[in-house]
Amino acid sequence: MGHRLIHGASESCALPHGHNEFVTVRLDPTSLARLDGRGNMPVSFQKAKQTWHRFVDERLDHALQLAGDDPLLAWFKTHEPARAARIVVTPGDPTTELMVCLLMAKINAFLLAEGGVLRCSELSIEETPTNTVSFSGNPEEMIPAGRSPEACWWNRADMSISD
């Protein structure tokens, strides 16, 4: 994915640029139960990853990440509205630290909508071979506040990447 950081973190990151990011997700059952002696898993791997993989492949792959107040976002909405739909809009700069929290909230929304048998307990993004950010905990405690949770794309079990 590509992004740019406009709020002073690094001048070299202020221009749009990309990374070959690898996202790793750890899923845990929401409650412990003895395996059934047949399938021996709470949910099949195919079912557990189906919605998430579709989201990554169809919405995140080749997407651009921009802050909600980035002037480039307004430009796309005015001049290239079809391409604006491919922009991941974040509350503030789309740093890797923020993205791990947003994506953890998103996968947990998917998992809850699919029965809540599993939850994401850790999410890591490898931005470069020497830079990986991992998060475990409650992403809502880290994501910038200011909007109702229902109004945020990362809390909805749909394919949205902006509001």
Predicted regions and their residues:
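Charge-rich, low-complexity N-terminal segments
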Residues: 1-163
